[in-house]
A protein has these predicted regions:
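Surface-exposed, charge/polar-rich loops and edge strands
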Residues: 24-72, 76-88, 102-237
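Boundary at the C-terminal end of the N-terminal hydrophobic targeting segment
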Residues: 18-22
Length: 237
């Protein structure tokens, strides 16, 4: 537990937005269902990558908020965490939000809810439970499975960019599919597009890829993916 407490102490610097009182600061001994504030610097990701297009969009949105607006926004987006071996908090959702806050230099902490405190488990036991709950996406930024959970980045700032995750977000924003509660739905769509849509490096690469991805998103091949939306001519009225 000393390692986490030491990091926490070093992170308590002035921030652009100071989260309001009413929540305790993160502590490795907090029980499940506790609400707290947690420094982004100590959060450990449960996925390797984010879509940087989405991160950049959210960072710009956050950058335009007043301190009061951002405070309300963060209270509406409470981050679920699981406390793992060594007392480290693992971020189970809102990884794009956490990365966007770093990008915007707008804040260094999130409101969080402890879903489970598994700090007493061994590493293998911890990851077995994480997999059982579907609380980790153990693939790299190209969609390939990780050989081991220890291959995950250790910090939010070190998460890598998966361009196809950005493409999946762009398609969802255009109603190519619906947002769902299904875990890691964006990555399922990213892998679907990865196998079917070319994403180049040019200035218009994402625009061109989005047009193509919108077509395949409505195809019969995609019907089993979370949030699938049938093409307009197939929707019964």
């Amino acid at each position: 537990m000393r390692c986490v407490r030491a990091i926490l102490c070093s992170c308590l610097l002035p921030v652009s937005v100071t989260l309001a009182a009413g929540n305790v600061s993160f502590d490795p001994n907090l029980p499940a269902h506790s609400l707290c504030t947690v420094e982004i610097a100590v959060l450990r990701p449960t996925q390797s990558a984010v879509g940087m297009k989405e991160v950049e969009f959210r960072a710009k949105k956050i950058g335009k908020m007043t301190a009061t607006q951002l405070e309300h926004y963060l209270r509406k987006h409470v981050a679920p965490i699981a406390i793992g071996p060594g007392g480290f908090p693992y971020l189970l959702d809102h990884q794009h939000l956490a990365r966007a806050l770093l990008q915007a230099h707008a804040g260094k902490a999130l409101y969080a809810e402890v879903k489970e405190n598994w700090s007493k488990l061994s590493e293998p036991e911890f990851w077995a439970r994480m997999k059982e709950r579907d609380w980790a996406y153990l693939h790299d930024e190209t969609g390939k499975p990780l050989s081991d959970p220890t291959s995950l980045p250790r910090t939010i700032g070190n998460m890598r960019d998966d361009p196809y995750r950005s493409l999946a977000w762009l398609v969802r924003e255009k109603d190519g599919y619906s947002q769902t509660e299904s875990p890691y739905a964006g990555f399922q769509w990213a892998d679907f597009f990865r196998a079917r849509v070319h994403l180049g490096d040019g200035t218009n690469a994402f625009d061109e890829a989005t047009l193509e991805a919108m077509k395949v998103a409505h195809s019969p091949e995609a019907k089993d993916l979370p949030g699938y939306v049938a093409p307009p001519d197939r929707i019964s009225h």
